[in-house]
A protein has these predicted regions:
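Transmembrane beta-barrel outer-membrane domains
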Residues: 66-72, 113-122, 151-156, 213-217, ...
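C-terminal structural cap/anchor segments
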Residues: 312-404
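Outer-membrane pore/translocation modules
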Residues: 98-114, 168, 175, 180, ...
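Flexible, solvent-exposed coil segments and beta strand-coil junctions
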Residues: 57-58, 138-143, 202-203, 228-235, ...
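Extracellular loop and loop/strand-boundary signature of outer-membrane beta-barrel proteins
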Residues: 60-65, 108-111, 146-149, 191, ...
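Signature for the C-terminal beta-barrel architecture of outer-membrane proteins
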Residues: 130-134, 152-322, 327, 379, ...
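Beta-barrel outer-membrane channel/assembly domains of diderm bacteria
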Residues: 2-141, 164-166, 362-366, 375-377, ...
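Flexible, surface-exposed loop regions and adjacent strand-edge segments
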Residues: 53-57, 106-109, 153-154, 190-196, ...
Length: 450
């Protein structure tokens, strides 16, 4: 933390030396600040089956701990001061309630939706000098491998420091320090069920788990984005997290990410070509015996897409992971893989010895006069071969659909409906038997931004 404290002093000195500022006084900076917010009403419902044993299954039964429904109502309020000598203060509070949830819903969604109360998710000091922007404190971060997800009612956040510079032509440089993480609920942060999350020195390491946070010491990251070549975007990022505790052992974790995105404009439509190579370097493990899982793995992925074809779009994505080890995609649930599905996301595709595929079909109804209405159909596969001497492996098949509507008559209001059915076929190698369990989840989201 000495580094962060020194950075604050440096920013203060630099700010006072600058003659460029928006507000004349500190009082004006607060008076001229901007307030924005969002009202959310979300309803989730899921029905889940499971095997009676994860290592020696003999039958499929209903997973009562992961079946139920929940209605959440949330208020998000954001306030950012006007600039004063280049400085700004920013805050965001998320207040959530689940007024009608029953015991079944509480249990089913305790990790990601059931957490009543409020959390100050952003509370930062920002400073801008030329083309350099810095933030210290609690803040939302969205980079390929440090990324707080907003797919649940409470958005994930980080506490630390970030700096972004765009002085180099067509290039963005970013560096960051992560001290703490805020998840989705108190349960997800390792605390008592049913409350709002807090900031703790534990985080989601996606690929190990999407719901359980693990203790860590500190984390650092650096990234570069370059757009020097027309229609081509190149991205690279590295992150290091110290003393990550999986419950089995405690090890440092290195995570790296590279990506190339190329868009080819043609007459009446666009073609997209995307490639991604990512990996994690660590001795961290989970599980025991022949079912131990290592995370010293890689994933290679590619995507071909067509868009803006009279409102239609389509994409085919494929990815493969290393044969012996799974991959840690990053910190936070926003660090998703290319073949993440609409509702159930990335976890199946990050396992060791897994080939995953996804097909997307989209349509924008504004092309036929219905502004704001969009749809998506999705089909996904994540097929896993046996890893070393593991007792089981599993194949996932996903069918998903979504419709979203930005209501033109009321600016700021949007509605979204998502559904996914996932079939999980588990092979038990001791007697070469197969068992299929289903998972169905429906999500409705109504949001009003002001």
């Amino acid at each position: 933390m000495k580094l962060v404290k020194l950075s604050v002093v440096t920013m203060l000195i630099a700010g006072m030396a600058s003659c460029s500022f928006a507000a004349d006084t500190l009082a004006d900076a607060f008076k001229n600040g901007k307030v924005s917010g969002e009202l959310k009403v979300w309803y989730f419902d899921k029905d889940t089956e499971k095997l009676n044993s994860s290592t020696s299954p003999t039958s499929v039964l209903k997973d009562t701990a992961k079946s139920g429904d929940i209605l959440n109502t949330t208020v998000v309020l954001n306030y950012v001061t006007d600039a004063f000598y280049g400085f700004k203060l920013g805050t965001t509070i998320q207040a959530n309630a689940a007024p009608f949830v029953d015991e079944e819903g509480k249990e089913a969604y305790k990790d990601d939706m059931y957490g009543s109360g409020a959390v100050l998710s952003e509370a930062y000091l920002g400073y801008t000098l030329g083309k350099t922007n810095a933030k210290i404190g609690r803040q939302f971060i969205s980079t390929p491998i440090v990324n707080g997800s907003g797919s649940r009612i409470v958005k994930e956040s980080f506490e630390g420091a970030t700096i972004v510079n765009t002085d180099l032509p067509a290039t963005t440089l970013m560096a960051g320090y992560i001290d703490k993480f805020q998840g989705r609920t108190s349960t997800g942060m390792g605390e008592t069920d049913g409350n709002a999350p807090t900031f703790e020195k534990r985080a989601i390491f996606l690929g190990v788990s999407a719901s359980t946070t693990y203790k860590f010491d500190d984390a650092y990251t650096a990234a570069v984005i370059n757009k020097s070549i027309p229609n081509l975007t190149l991205t690279g990022q590295y992150a290091w997290a110290g003393d990550v505790n999986s419950g089995i052992n405690t090890k440092d974790v290195d995570i790296y990410y590279t990506e190339a995105n190329y868009v080819l404009p043609l007459n009446g439509f666009k073609l997209g070509f995307d490639a991604n190579y990512r990996g994690s370097k660590t001795d961290l493990i989970s599980g025991t015996g022949v079912n131990v899982i290592g995370y010293d793995g890689t994933q290679t992925a590619g995507r071909i897409s067509i868009s803006e074809l009279a409102g239609f779009g389509a994409a085919f994505t494929a990815a493969t992971t290393s044969s012996d080890d799974a991959v840690i995609a990053g910190m936070g649930n926003g660090a998703s893989s290319y073949t993440a599905t609409l509702v159930k996301a990335s976890s199946p595709s990050l396992r060791a010895n897994t080939d995953s595929y996804r097909f997307d079909f989209t349509y924008d109804f504004s092309k036929v006069g219905v502004d704001g209405l969009k749809t998506i159909l999705q089909y996904g596969l994540a097929n896993q071969d046996r890893v070393k001497s593991a007792t089981t492996s599993a194949d996932y098949i996903s069918y998903a659909a979504g419709v979203s509507y930005a209501v033109p008559a009321l600016k700021g209001l949007s509605l979204e409906l998502q559904y996914e059915k996932q079939e999980i076929e588990t092979t038990r190698y001791s007697n070469n038997t197969k068992f299929t369990a289903d998972l169905d989840e429906l999500r409705f989201k109504a949001n009003y931004k002001f």
